């Protein structure tokens, strides 16, 4: 009877902690200080479901690789506030000029808004696509819609091999990437990648696929645009040409993959 009582207490505490964590993640996604232009994309990017799928937790050391303008960083940093457990990896020498501006704006934005989001640690990716961090091992590494660039430049294997080195044993890698049709030819310049191709490449760098999700799928995505995935929102590179059509399609069809370090 006594053991049953303690089991009941344990289950109640676990349930409370889980609910508290979900509430905290919801609060981070609904943070009033998030940019409005980011909030309106939640219906496409599904941040709460995606981060829950990747098993985000405040007691984990988390690394986001190439955060861009900080769409996900706004949410993760607020969720991880006061833990000092959230780090981003940016390029030491960006491969294209526009990334200099994007990275500078990212650093300035989050430095000026620590009280609104939380502190973010920064490490660098060197010219050999090695993650330079001699201090930490991470429990969860995330990257969103970046892999086509690394594949196009021939650096994806090196980058994911480096991720494997800085993950703790049993650590999780979460990847979201624009998804090509399986019968299509490889063309990373369009932004799309075959799911089977990417799984195979990442597993060869010391990972095992744990699970995949259709959280970010979009069956309306035709994937046959001359200007690639950037034809769709939010970029809409064709301007007013067929804008209504592309808005109706929405953002790209994306794979959502969860790997574990072997």
Residue map of PLM features:
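Conserved class I S-adenosyl-L-methionine
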Residues: 58-68
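Short glycine-dipeptide loop
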Residues: 59, 82-83, 167-173
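A short acidic, Gly/Pro-enriched loop at the edge of an enzyme's catalytic core
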Residues: 131-141
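Conserved beta-strand signature within the Rossmann-like core of class I S-adenosyl-L-methionine
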Residues: 87-89, 170-179
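A short, conserved alpha-helix within the catalytic core of class I
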Residues: 126-127, 149-162
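S-adenosyl-L-methionine
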Residues: 100-130
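Class I SAM-dependent methyltransferase Rossmann-like catalytic core
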Residues: 21-58
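A short glycine-rich, Lys/Arg-flanked "PGG" loop and its adjoining helix->strand segment in the class I
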Residues: 77, 156-169
């Amino acid at each position: 009877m006594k053991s049953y009582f303690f089991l009941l207490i344990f289950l109640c505490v676990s349930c409370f902690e889980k609910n508290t964590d979900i509430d905290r993640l919801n609060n981070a996604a609904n943070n009033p200080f998030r940019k409005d232009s980011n909030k309106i994309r939640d219906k496409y990017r599904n941040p709460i479901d995606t981060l829950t799928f990747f098993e985000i937790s405040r007691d984990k050391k988390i690394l986001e690789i190439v955060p861009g303008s900080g769409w996900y960083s706004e949410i993760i940093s607020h969720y991880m506030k006061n833990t000092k457990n959230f780090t981003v990896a940016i390029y030491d020498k960006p491969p294209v000029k526009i990334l200099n501006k994007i990275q500078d704006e990212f650093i300035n934005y989050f430095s000026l808004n620590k009280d609104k989001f939380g502190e973010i640690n920064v490490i660098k990716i060197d010219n050999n696509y090695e993650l330079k961090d001699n201090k930490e091992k991470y429990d969860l590494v995330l990257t969103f819609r970046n892999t086509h660039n690394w594949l196009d430049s021939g650096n994806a294997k090196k980058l994911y091999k480096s991720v494997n080195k800085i993950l703790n044993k049993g650590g999780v890698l979460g990847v979201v990437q624009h998804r090509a049709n399986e019968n299509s030819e490889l063309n990373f310049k369009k932004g799309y990648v075959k799911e089977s191709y990417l799984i195979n490449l990442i597993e060869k760098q010391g990972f095992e696929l744990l699970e995949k999700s259709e959280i970010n799928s979009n069956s309306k995505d035709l994937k046959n645009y001359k200007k690639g995935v950037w034809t769709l929102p939010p970029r809409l590179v064709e301007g007013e040409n067929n804008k209504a059509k592309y808005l109706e399609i929405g953002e790209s069809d994306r794979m959502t993959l969860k790997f574990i370090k072997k």
